[in-house]
């Protein structure tokens, strides 16, 4: 399978925007999940069962946070690379025109 490299800075920034939307969606859903877990806690749960449930939810919340951080990392990398590509392209054009 041939690799395709994205070299259009505008497309790279558009793709970065998509990663931001995905990150926001994951973050929103994780927040709702955590709120739901907090609402359930104490409603018939007690002792070890409640503690285990909250611990599991905390671990899942951290996993979602890690996903959000990775999505933000990809977003930031795309924006950075788009900026670098444009700068290098401009420098190359200046060299060729002189």
Curated annotation (Swiss-Prot):
Database matches in Pfam families: WXG100
GO cellular component terms listed in the entry, alphabetical order: extracellular region
Keyword annotations: Secreted
Induction notes from the record: Differentially expressed under different growth conditions. Highly expressed in sputum bacteria.
Subunit (UniProt): Strongly interacts with EsxL to form a heterodimeric complex under reducing conditions. The complex is regulated by the redox state of EsxL.
Keyword field contains RNA-binding: no
Protein name: ESAT-6-like protein EsxK
Source superkingdom: Bacteria
Transmembrane domains' residue ranges: none
InterPro entries reported for this sequence: ESAT-6-like_sf, T7SS_ESAT-6-like
Similarity field: Belongs to the WXG100 family. CFP-10 subfamily.
Consequence of gene loss (knockout): EsxKL deletion mutant shows reduced intracellular growth in primary human macrophages. Also shows growth defects in the absence of host cells.
Predominant location category: secreted
Subcellular location field: Secreted
